[in-house]
Amino acid sequence: MTFSVAIALLKDWSRMHYIQGMHPNVAKWIEIDRRLNETAPQKSEAWLKLRHGMLTASDAATALGCNKYEKPFDLLLKKCNLAPKFTGNDATRHGEKYEDEARIKFEQIHPELGKVWEFGVCQHPEYPFLGGSPDGVTEESNSLVEIKCPMMRDIGDGEVPEHYMPQVNSFFSFFLFVS
């Protein structure tokens, strides 16, 4: 059994990317997530509070200086509660609007991976200040799914924009430590 990350970069449904690799033992995380989802389902206030205290996979590109939309110092201010609360913008609202549709489309294009279940927060087992929330985990193949729905950019086949790679690599780090 392999473990992998699937990235659904959706402007055009036909362009989805599947990255192979990863550790086969995800059952432990799925069980932890089931318990967490009872108290902190994704996008809930409890989920936001858990994530706020962590440097998350979504923050990785900013922390490394690779995010053209946010500077590392702004991330520091945000984590210290010294920045205005981000309430979304057109791009994030667009992504949230189409995320469920993208998940369903991904399942249709990759039936061999099974159903994609939403996933809550996973905390790094060795460094609890690190965490992340993949957009889903597949039922049959124990693959993580990260969905991106860009508004205006055309994405070529096999192309994952560089600024998404720190987020994906963070997920690799978290799940390679599962025992």
Task: Identify the meaning behind each predicted range.
Residues 1-97, 101, 109:
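Charged, glycine-rich intrinsically disordered N-terminal tails and low-complexity linkers that flank
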Residues 85, 90-96, 100-179:
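Mg2+/Mn2+-dependent nuclease catalytic core
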